């Protein structure tokens, strides 16, 4: 398992995680 692959997968994971948190933040009325 190369370091590049790990970094790429981790970046995708962080993007999905932050996107979900952003949606929750919008739902909560940007409090």
UniProtKB/Swiss-Prot annotation:
Coiled coil: none annotated. Induction: Produced in the A cells of the islets of Langerhans in response to a drop in blood sugar concentration. Keywords: Hormone, Secreted. GO terms for molecular function: hormone activity. One of its GO terms (cellular component) is extracellular region. InterPro entries: Glucagon, Glucagon_GIP_secretin_VIP. It holds the Pfam family Hormone_2. It is found in: Secreted. Glucagon plays a key role in glucose metabolism and homeostasis. Regulates blood glucose by increasing gluconeogenesis and decreasing glycolysis. Belongs to the glucagon family. This is Glucagon-4. It comes from Huso dauricus.
